[in-house]
Amino acid sequence: MRTLIVDDSAFMRMAIRSMLASSPDIKIVGDACNGKEAVEKAKSLHPDVVIMDVNMPVMDGLTAVKTIMNTSPVPIIMFSTLTTEGSKEALEALHLGAIDFTAKSESHHDVNKAEKELVDKIRNIHSSNPNLLRLINMRKFKGEVVRGKWRCAGDFGILIGSSTGGPSSLEQVIPRLPGDLPAPVFVVQHMPEGGFCRQMAERLNFLSELEVKEARNNEKVTAGIVYVAPGGYHMTVRKALDVTRIKLIKSQPVHAVMPAVDVTAESMLAVYGKNIVASILTGMGFDGASGFKTIRDAGGSTIACSEDTCVIFGMPKAAIEAGAIDVVKPIFEIPEEIVKRLEAKCNGK
């Protein structure tokens, strides 16, 4: 993987080189000390991935991300103290087209963790679709809200799972779901603990007819609300005395992530049974494959994003190969498919 390092600190550029030195499959093709240099070298060096700081002179990282994604799109990983969990800069970078972020840290333990995260993300990045990232930025919010005709009896639930590339993909799906949706929507986006998921929920809420919020422990579940799992917790649903509530669980990661799609899927099955419509959008690994297979086997509907419109095809591919998916659709058709399948279930078809 041809990698370009962008950071205004010579020490940090050297530190990143050191982090990647033990990985022979990762080749450093150059470095830059500001965003302007990054834009120029992204054009001339044709890297497979760019590691980008945020706070730099001449041109900051966010401006550089926007410029690169408009001129010579390439997967970008933000790597900065300003992109710690929950940071507004991290969300803005992802909105502008960056594919993921990893936070710098000062402690030895966290430095080792950041090194592993960075190497893993670079190695998986080759399966991303940089032209799609540019396309998503150009097409955001242009699709109309999809309307349905509901005659519902019973409880229904919608599950959406995503990881790397998820924030931009979610912005293609959630804002196109109608405000009168007769089911709650549970979103599991892989993110570490912190305020990031809350910031993402607030942005989606601004863009959507539906109310979008970060889930709170023990809150009552209501149709027409999108619940985003907070980072660092598994999100489950439980029904007692005819009331469904969210239970946030602080336990061990599943598939090395928390929240995990599979955990939410299994808990939803106990509450909603076959009355589930579930969609997996993008991400590395295989989280969601097991839970979606269980949902499908129980009579629920499952949807995966197509490879040609998926940022990272790992999670959808794993679910497809596990026999867990009913239909594969382009990202821009997933809102219609969710509404169509929920409408069919509500109307007893």
Curated annotation (Swiss-Prot):
One Gene Ontology cellular component: cytoplasm
Alphabetically ordered keywords of this record: Chemotaxis, Cytoplasm, Hydrolase, Phosphoprotein
Function field: Involved in chemotaxis. Part of a chemotaxis signal transduction system that modulates chemotaxis in response to various stimuli. Catalyzes the demethylation of specific methylglutamate residues introduced into the chemoreceptors (methyl-accepting chemotaxis proteins or MCP) by CheR. Also mediates the irreversible deamidation of specific glutamine residues to glutamic acid.
Reaction(s) catalysed (UniProt annotation): [protein]-L-glutamate 5-O-methyl ester + H2O = L-glutamyl-[protein] + methanol + H(+); L-glutaminyl-[protein] + H2O = L-glutamyl-[protein] + NH4(+)
A Gene Ontology biological process term: chemotaxis
Family matches, as NCBIfam families: PRK00742.1
InterPro entries: CheB-like, CheB_C, CheY-like_superfamily, Sig_transdc_resp-reg_Me-estase, Sig_transdc_resp-reg_receiver
PANTHER family (UniProt xref): PROTEIN-GLUTAMATE METHYLESTERASE/PROTEIN-GLUTAMINE GLUTAMINASE (PTHR42872), PROTEIN-GLUTAMATE METHYLESTERASE_PROTEIN-GLUTAMINE GLUTAMINASE (PTHR42872:SF6)
Domain of life: Archaea
EC class (word): hydrolase
Protein name: Protein-glutamate methylesterase/protein-glutamine glutaminase 1
Domain notes: Contains a C-terminal catalytic domain, and an N-terminal region which modulates catalytic activity.
EC number: 3.1.1.61, 3.5.1.44
Start and end residues of each Response regulatory domain: 2-119
Subcellular location: Cytoplasm
Active site annotation, chain numbering: S163, H190, D287
UniProt GO molecular function: phosphorelay response regulator activity; protein-glutamate methylesterase activity; protein-glutamine glutaminase activity
CheB-type methylesterase domain boundaries: 158-345
Gene responsible for this protein: cheB1
PTM annotation (4-aspartylphosphate): residues: D53
Post-translational modification: Phosphorylated by CheA. Phosphorylation of the N-terminal regulatory domain activates the methylesterase activity.
Family assignment from sequence similarity: Belongs to the CheB family.
